[in-house]
Amino acid sequence: MNYKNLLAGLAAGLLLYAQAGWHVALAAVPPDAPKDVKHILGFYYGNGENILIRENGGRLELLYRFSMQDKAFGSSNIYPLAKEHFDSYTLNEAGPMTSSESTVRFERDPDGYGISCRVGGHVYSRAFVGTTTGERGKELRFPTHSAEEWEQLRAQAVAAPMPDELAAGQQVELVDASTVAGLKIDSRYGQADNCFGAPLYTSEKLFVGKEAAAALGKVQQHLAAYGYGLVLWDAYRPWSVSKLANLALPAESKDMLEDPETKGSAHNTGNAVDVSLYDLATGEQLEMISGFDEPSFRQFASYAGGTSRQRYLRDLLREAMELYGFKGIEMEWWHFDFRPGTNWAHLNVNM
């Protein structure tokens, strides 16, 4: 048997299969949900219960969760809603012995936002979160500091010594992230438009470990076939900046970040990144399932709500990143660690 020809044939077959699958994936990108639909999607509460309204395949679905611990609504019962007319739907609950039918009606405010949902005789009120289309929640903003206070905090952070134990491990060579072809830089902590209301970095440049940068380049090439590119929101963070963030947080919020004195941040290693997607044709960032640093259930990587398109984009991003050595975390869909099993050294080099 000619194994060389056999292997060549198998390789060609796999290539054709991959290309076919690739085009299926390209064709399967869900269309965006209409704006009036987005305005009623989200979280509703009442009667000691919580429900979630999402769009799936062009239809609305009601998700009912049994446990408050199911923050992502991943174990919810899912009920398709059959549209009767504008904002009025029918929910059919069918079982092996019985079945029931309920009317589901949404009430909107004058601006078109859903504010309540009536399911049969029960009324659920809308809880707004985030600022993406259809939501009108508030962005996360910590109490602000004056310019003078920021300078004092920065000086205190720079003067603080990084614990020796954090410096142990494999050090990376940092490179300018802008050298990765096609990567869009949008340094959220290099600008004032973030949860601190002030830039934490002294520059909007972002740096990342050399190997991680090469992997980002491969992710960028992978996503280009879909018409998308990577947006880099954050990457290497000097330990002193993690210390600055900790000092700037109010006492009741300090547990929102890793303690810089004991654990530090994965971003200190140069191998953690916060990323999203942009449209290669327009250069515009895509609307994802939640905003950056949004402190809500929508930030979870397995969150079951939103629209089909939003979930598709989030999952596509995760799939592409994990294909090239990154690993996502459940808490934040935008955060990825490069080769997390490696003992990376924390760095305190100001770039």
Explain the meaning of each model-derived region.
Residues 9-20:
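Bacterial N-terminal signal peptides
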Residues 103-106, 110-113, 322-336:
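Low-complexity, intrinsically disordered Gly/Pro/Thr-rich segments
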Residues 239-245, 336-343:
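Beta-rich nucleic-acid/ligand-interaction surfaces
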Residues 134-233, 248-331, 339-351:
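Extracytoplasmic cell-surface/polysaccharide-interacting catalytic and binding patches
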Residues 19-148:
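Peripheral terminal and inter-domain segments
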Residues 2-10:
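Bacterial N-terminal signal peptides that target proteins for export
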